[in-house]
């Protein structure tokens, strides 16, 4: 391939949102308010799928005069943003829980639904009986919908098996999707999502540490699986702090990043535990303490906040402002699962602004570079900088903020989604403002 030949030139964008200026791996405090944005700019992607140049349109045109491009897109009147990163999802399951929505609207709490045989255990029963082919088809459909909403990198958890064979089945499904779809995937083993029926917490912990994790390590070493992270639901009535520590440490010892559910329904001191263990990320944190926030800021453990959860369960939202002001690396995720059925990171950003008092720049940073950091991918994803993967979202609007501002409007705003310089979604139904 000629050194003067490139896969894609996107030129003349009204706004090109780089997010980062100097290769930052995450943004905190005032950095999140001052995102790097170029006016009338272009971005160039090579045949290897990586960004080769970004800058003012006239400078790029002059610098690459005579170059050949497989595709040229004139983005006049449009805005270009980095592909969005969804840092927390549960997308592999069978059996929706639409019937439980009525229970919640009538006042049932999450744990009341759980104790009545609903919630996670309902989904576990259906997922155990579903074929691998059924689960893969459903996962592919869900990931396609996420891509159409601008997500180009997503964390995908297991956790609706709670026994070795089904957890491995779910991880195989995630691995198959990784190989067959363009969207980037970070795979998380979440066998400690709940205590299986008929077992105690102690028995479940022993099974995970002595049986499940060694098998997953073996399958990963042989190339049959690719698992990146380990997760535990650290919660009253689920896995306590001692069991959580045991499972997370075992996962860390086999090379997995710690990325777990903590301080969601009760203050469990999960934030302290995560900071102590060197966790990459802790999700939820609705009940985090002041000391926990300080500990996370010091340890550079990212807080993956999930406004959809507080919204659907009518919980007090996470204290995003306190975390931001303390210097915590704040990221966002959709928490897509049968309980919180949301594919859309633009809607998550809007909810984060309204419910958690984040600004629009903070929400975008939390859905790009900081979410990538939570998945240990901020060296390759989360901003539009030379050397990073060429993942773009292009919207039909004069300012990038419309992607956050127009609640539920992303389907008419997003014109193109691009991954590694390839068009993975082209929307001919965009409407002018």
From Swiss-Prot:
Fe(3+) binds at residues 261, 335. It catalyses: 4-imidazolone-5-propanoate + H2O = N-formimidoyl-L-glutamate. Transmembrane segments: none annotated. SUPFAM superfamilies: Composite domain of metallo-dependent hydrolases (SSF51338), Metallo-dependent hydrolases (SSF51556). It comes from the Eukaryota. Its cofactor is Zn(2+); Fe(3+). 4-imidazolone-5-propanoate binds at residues 160, 193, 264. NCBIfam families: hutI. This is Probable imidazolonepropionase. The gene is amdhd1.
């Amino acid at each position: 391939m000629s050194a003067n030949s490139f896969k894609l030139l996107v030129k003349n964008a009204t706004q090109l949102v780089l997010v980062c200026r100097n290769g930052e791996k995450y943004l905190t405090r005032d950095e999140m308010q001052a995102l790097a944005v170029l006016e009338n700019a272009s971005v160039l992607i090579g045949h290897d799928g990586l960004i080769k140049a970004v800058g003012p349109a006239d400078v790029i045109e002059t610098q690459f005069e005579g170059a050949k491009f497989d595709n040229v897109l004139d983005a006049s009147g449009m805005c270009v943003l980095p592909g969005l990163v969804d840092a927390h999802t549960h997308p592999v399951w069978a059996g929706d829980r639409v019937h439980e929505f009525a229970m919640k609207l009538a006042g049932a709490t999450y744990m009341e639904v759980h104790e009545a045989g609903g919630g996670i255990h309902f989904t576990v029963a259906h997922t155990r009986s579903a074929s691998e082919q059924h689960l893969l088809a459903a996962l592919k459909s869900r990931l396609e919908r996420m891509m159409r909403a601008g997500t180009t990198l997503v964390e995908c958890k297991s956790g609706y098996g709670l026994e070795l064979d089904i957890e491995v089945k779910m991880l195989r499904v995630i691995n198959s999707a990784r190989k067959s779809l363009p969207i980037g995937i970070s795979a998380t083993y979440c066998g400690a999502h709940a205590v299986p029926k008929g077992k105690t917490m102690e028995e479940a912990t022993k099974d995970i540490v002595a049986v499940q994790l060694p098998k997953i390590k073996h399958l990963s070493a042989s190339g049959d699986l690719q698992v990146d992270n380990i997760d535990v639901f650290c919660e009253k009535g689920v896995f306590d702090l001692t069991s959580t520590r045991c499972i997370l440490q075992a996962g860390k010892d086999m090379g997995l990043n710690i990325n777990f559910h903590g301080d969601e329904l009760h203050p469990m001191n999960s934030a302290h535990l995560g900071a102590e263990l060197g966790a990459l990320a802790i999700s939820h944190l609705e009940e985090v303490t002041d000391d926990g926030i300080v500990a996370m800021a010091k340890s550079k453990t990212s807080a993956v906040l999930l406004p959809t959860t507080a919204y659907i369960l009518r919980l007090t939202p996470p204290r995003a402002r306190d975390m931001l002001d303390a210097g915590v690396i704040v990221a966002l995720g959709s928490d897509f699962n049968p309980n919180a059925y949301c594919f859309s990171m633009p809607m998550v950003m809007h909810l984060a602004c309204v419910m958690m008092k984040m600004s629009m720049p903070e929400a975008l940073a939390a859905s790009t570079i900081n979410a990538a950091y939570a998945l240990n991918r901020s060296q390759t994803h989360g901003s539009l900088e030379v050397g990073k993967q060429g993942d773009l979202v292009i919207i039909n609007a004069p300012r990038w903020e419309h992607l956050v501002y127009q609640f539920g409007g992303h389907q008419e705003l997003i014109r193109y989604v691009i991954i590694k310089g390839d068009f993975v979604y082209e929307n001919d139904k965009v409407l002018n403002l």
